From Swiss-Prot:
Belongs to the binding-protein-dependent transport system permease family. OppBC subfamily. It comes from Escherichia coli (strain K12). SUPFAM superfamilies: MetI-like. One of its GO terms (biological process) is peptide transport. The keyword RNA-binding does not apply. The gene is yejB. GO terms for cellular component: ATP-binding cassette (ABC) transporter complex, substrate-binding subunit-containing; membrane; plasma membrane. The chain crosses the membrane at residues 9-29, 38-58, 136-156, 173-193, 225-245, 285-305, 327-347. Residues 1-8, 59-135, 194-224, 306-326 are periplasmic. InterPro entries: MetI-like, MetI-like_sf. It is found in: Cell inner membrane. It comes from the Bacteria. This is Inner membrane ABC transporter permease protein YejB. Probably part of a binding-protein-dependent transport system. Probably responsible for the translocation of the substrate across the membrane. Gene3D superfamilies: MetI-like (1.10.3720.10).
């Protein structure tokens, strides 16, 4: 197991490098970067001071149209601006350096977990990630916990009544829930229960109320649960299928084994066979899959659900950074997402070997 873990940990480095490198060069050839957006903001008069790296800015008063001819500029939005202004904007965002120099600087900074500062926010990228990460982790943990609390009893019941009408109908509903994307459930929940068209039972935005700090501790708990209900429901509704069917199939596999036949021949009751023998063995792989389920909820649920419910998590942070072309934040969130996913996959493999020593990854 030690050699396998070393190999997996060493594979994290080239995987991170490949993902960051591919996205870096894709972004370089994509139109509409931060310089283009800054130029557009100046031309349309949307900002008096445009924030740049280090919190400084470019004065719009220096960018009166009709000064100079910059038809040779690489930025299509800057045709009426002074070339010196465009050069200043380009310098502030670091795009005056060659692409290879920016690339290697980014790699060196990321090795040291130095993601720089946001282009459009007065904070470092690491600070923004630290503030946003707990929200995404909380959403993922709640979703995973509820999925386990529902899927395990449901899977056991489906195994006990295998082939019955309950099994058939529950399978149909599970498949339908699995096929419908989480964001569609989120829209339905908002329309029906968040003041859309019918009931106004739950808040639409945020994780806590505006007066959260002034509430007593018990009301803080209630307020938090009140806000998290709809986002968690939207995340978990489509997440029951895989774990429920895994639980059912694990039970059915155990029931067919020889030790169950022997226990029945000895006169052991079906209840004791189910809960004292089959349950313990069937739950090994189900429990070991907790990290993998959390990864699924963390990645698939964080982006769209956080955007739709305005939860200040890592998914919403990455989405807003992508829309505004805030490259340091965008690449920083991508780096953290990838690193967490790779490490949790390793934890998942370790948990499998802990609950079932027969699983051997050394032969891989």
């Amino acid at each position: 197991m030690g050699a396998y873990l070393i190999r997996r940990l060493l594979l994290v480095i080239p995987t991170l490098w490949a993902i960051i490198t591919i996205n870096f060069f894709i972004v370089q050839i994509a139109p509409g970067g931060p310089v283009d957006q800054a130029i557009a903001a100046i031309e349309f008069g949307n900002a008096g001071v445009l924030p740049g790296a280090g919190g400084e800015g470019v004065r719009a008063s220096h960018a009166q149209t009709g000064v100079g001819n910059i038809s040779d500029s690489n930025y299509r939005g800057g045709r009426g601006l002074d070339p010196e202004v465009i050069a200043e904007i380009t310098h502030r965002y670091g795009f005056d350096k060659p692409i290879h120099e920016r690339y290697f600087k980014m790699l060196w900074d990321y090795i040291r977990f130095d993601f720089g500062d946001s282009l459009f926010r007065s904070a470092s990228v690491l600070t923004l990630i630290k503030d946003s990460l707990p929200v995404s982790i909380t959403l993922g943990l709640w979703s995973t916990l509820i999925i386990y609390l529902v899927s395990i009893p449901l899977g056991i019941r489906k195994a006990v009544y295998n082939g019955s009408r309950f099994d058939v109908w529950s399978s149909a509903f599970i498949i339908i829930g699995y096929a419908i994307p989480a964001f569609l459930f989120a829209i339905l929940l908002i329309v029906f229960f968040a003041g859309g068209s019918y009931f106004d039972l739950f808040p639409l935005r945020g994780l806590v109320s505006a007066n959260f700090d002034s509430l007593p501790w018990y009301q803080k708990i209630t307020d938090y649960l009140w806000h998290i209900t709809l986002p968690v429901l939207a995340t978990v509704i489509g997440g029951f299928a895989a774990l429920t069917m895994l639980t059912k199939n694990s039970f059915l596999d155990e029931v067919r084994k020889q030790y169950v036949v022997t226990a029945r021949a000895k006169g052991v009751s079906e209840k004791n066979i189910l809960w004292k023998h089959v349950f313990r063995n069937a739950m090994l792989l189900v429990i070991a899959g907790f990290p993998a389920t959390f990864i699924s909820m963390f990645f698939t649920g964080s982006l769209l659900i956080e955007v739709m419910f305005s939860l200040n998590g890592l998914g919403l942070l990455g989405y807003e950074a992508t829309v505004s072309r805030d490259y340091p934040v965008m690449f920083g969130t991508l780096y953290i997402f990838t690193l967490i996913g790779l490490l949790l996959n390793i934890v998942s493999d370790i948990s499998y070997t802990l609950v079932d020593p027969r699983i051997d990854f050394e032969g891989r």
